[in-house]
Amino acid sequence: MATTKYEVTYIIKPDVDEESKKALVENYDKVIADNGGTMVESKDWGKRRFAYEIDKYREGTYHIMTFTADNADAVNEFGRLSKIDNMILRSMTVKLDK
């Protein structure tokens, strides 16, 4: 089976403190690794203003992860967890070209 490269961008609420944000990022990096993904890069893009309001917030902290995986388990688990996590406003997963 071919290894696929993915990029996940997610937005963290702006009122989350640094310690909680760091724990959240480490947790999601671990979710990817625990589900068969290999982390290539995980970086903070910082706080940015939105073009429109999301859940009564006008800005959020962007974080981007790039990883490889042999199957979609890591992507599916991240998607499931990010939907129920109240610290994440939005997330987007993109399959990158080989």
Curated annotation (Swiss-Prot):
Leader sequence segment: none
Keywords of the record: Ribonucleoprotein, Ribosomal protein, RNA-binding, rRNA-binding
CDD domains: bS6
GO cellular component, one term: cytoplasm
Keyword Ribonucleoprotein: yes
Matching Gene3D superfamilies: 3.30.70.60
Pfam family of the protein (one): Ribosomal_S6
Ribonucleoprotein recorded as keyword: yes
GO biological process, one term: translation
Molecular function GO labels: small ribosomal subunit rRNA binding; structural constituent of ribosome
InterPro entries, per the entry: Ribosomal_bS6, Ribosomal_bS6_sf, Ribosomal_S6_plastid/chlpt, Transl_elong_EF1B/ribsomal_bS6
Family matches, as PANTHER family: MITOCHONDRIAL 28S RIBOSOMAL PROTEIN S6, SMALL RIBOSOMAL SUBUNIT PROTEIN BS6M
Stated role: Binds together with bS18 to 16S ribosomal RNA.
Family to which the UniProt record says this protein belongs: Belongs to the bacterial ribosomal protein bS6 family.
Name of the protein in question: Small ribosomal subunit protein bS6
Organism listed in the record: Lactobacillus helveticus (strain DPC 4571)
Gene that specifies this protein: rpsF
